[in-house]
């Protein structure tokens, strides 16, 4: 890894990892090459970026302390606001580094996602993005089958939280890092994709590999609860109709994506994720 990348990665990790996050560097070009022009990140190909994901430890190390410290007068989505707080803390801690942050849930005015998180996780080498195209002679016919990322240490017990872009820092010599193919067999991939698409409520697809750590029962209850009911579950008041703070504004300062080429498989409805079953 280039010394400059290693230095920046260490700085970001020192800020985020104690709270249950992981960080992976990648080049914007690796992401853009897999997607149609409408989804490209509008930066030169060698631009450095970091993928950020949360591990099972984030719930206790970040979310609970965040709720106790009352960083927001109004809570709308505690997990998203907690993640936003920690990502912003990186940009505030290193003001000399220009960073632009895109959270996994951010969309353009036309509702197009600002980042395809699973594609970013794959190119960063963080988690393998298993899709229908990875199953030879698949058995699903005309059924819609969405893809899912599997982490080599946590299986499906993690969540992709966003991307940190560093405009002006280019790393053309950064070596690509392939994600570990931890579900290498056809049968295993069929079981994984069917579990994710048809039985995600039972959590079993997340054990596609034996994980080092799973979500606690407390986390599972929280993420199984419909979002509109999660504040009540935590004993928190429902939000008012009015925005509370500027901290709840979108994270990204991105401009309109530039044009370029690529394969539809990473975006087509047949492989795009369904409504999320939870982090």
UniProtKB/Swiss-Prot annotation:
Its cofactor is FAD; FMN. Disulfide bonds: none annotated. Disruption phenotype: Complete embryonic lethality. All die before 3.5 dpc. GO terms for molecular function: cobalamin binding; cyanocobalamin reductase (cyanide-eliminating) (NADP+) activity; demethylase activity; FAD binding; glutathione binding; oxidoreductase activity; protein homodimerization activity; transferase activity. The keyword Transferase applies. One of its GO terms (biological process) is glutathione metabolic process. Substrate binds at residues 104, 115-118, 129-131, 149, 160. It comes from the Eukaryota. Monomer in the absence of bound substrate. Homodimer; dimerization is triggered by binding to FMN or adenosylcobalamin. Interacts with LMBRD1 and ABCD4; the interaction ensures the transport of cobalamin from the lysosome to the cytoplasm. Forms a multiprotein complex with MMADHC, MTR and MTRR; the interaction with MTR could modulate MMACHC-dependent processing of cobalamin. Heterodimer with MMADHC; the interaction might play a role in the regulation of the balance between AdoCbl and MeCbl synthesis. Cobalamin (vitamin B12) cytosolic chaperone that catalyzes the reductive decyanation of cyanocob(III)alamin (cyanocobalamin, CNCbl) to yield cob(II)alamin and cyanide, using FAD or FMN as cofactors and NADPH as cosubstrate. Cyanocobalamin constitutes the inactive form of vitamin B12 introduced from the diet, and is converted into the active cofactors methylcobalamin (MeCbl) involved in methionine biosynthesis, and 5'-deoxyadenosylcobalamin (AdoCbl) involved in the TCA cycle. This is Cyanocobalamin reductase / alkylcobalamin dealkylase. The gene is Mmachc.
């Amino acid at each position: 890894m280039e010394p400059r990348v290693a230095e920046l990665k260490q700085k970001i990790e020192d800020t985020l990892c104690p709270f249950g996050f992981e960080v992976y560097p990648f080049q914007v070009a690796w992401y853009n090459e897999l997607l149609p022009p409408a989804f490209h990140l509008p930066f030169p190909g060698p631009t450095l970026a970091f993928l950020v994901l949360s591990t099972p430890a984030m719930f206790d190390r970040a979310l609970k302390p965040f709720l106790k410290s009352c960083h927001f007068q109004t809570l709308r989505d505690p997990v998203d606001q907690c993640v936003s707080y920690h990502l912003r803390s990186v940009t505030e801690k290193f003001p000399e580094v220009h960073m632009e942050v895109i959270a996994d849930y951010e969309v353009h005015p036309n509702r197009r996602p600002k980042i395809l998180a699973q594609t970013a996780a794959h190119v960063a080498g963080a988690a393998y993005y298993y899709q229908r195209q990875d199953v030879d002679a698949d058995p699903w016919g005309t059924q819609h089958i969405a893809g899912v990322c599997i982490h080599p240490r946590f299986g499906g017990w993690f969540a992709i939280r966003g991307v940190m872009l560093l405009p002006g820092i280019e790393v053309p010599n950064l070596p690509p890092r392939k994600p570990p193919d931890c579900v290498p067999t056809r049968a295993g991939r069929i079981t994984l994709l069917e579990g994710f698409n048809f039985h995600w409520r039972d959590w079993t697809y997340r054990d596609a590999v034996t994980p080092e750590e799973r979500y606690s029962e407390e986390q599972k209850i929280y993420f199984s609860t419909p979002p509109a009911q999660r504040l009540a579950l935590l004993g928190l008041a429902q939000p008012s109709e009015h925005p509370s703070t500027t901290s709840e504004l979108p994270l990204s300062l991105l401009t309109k994506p530039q044009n370029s080429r690529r394969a539809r498989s990473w975006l087509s409805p047949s492989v795009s994720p369904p409504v999320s079953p939870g982090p």
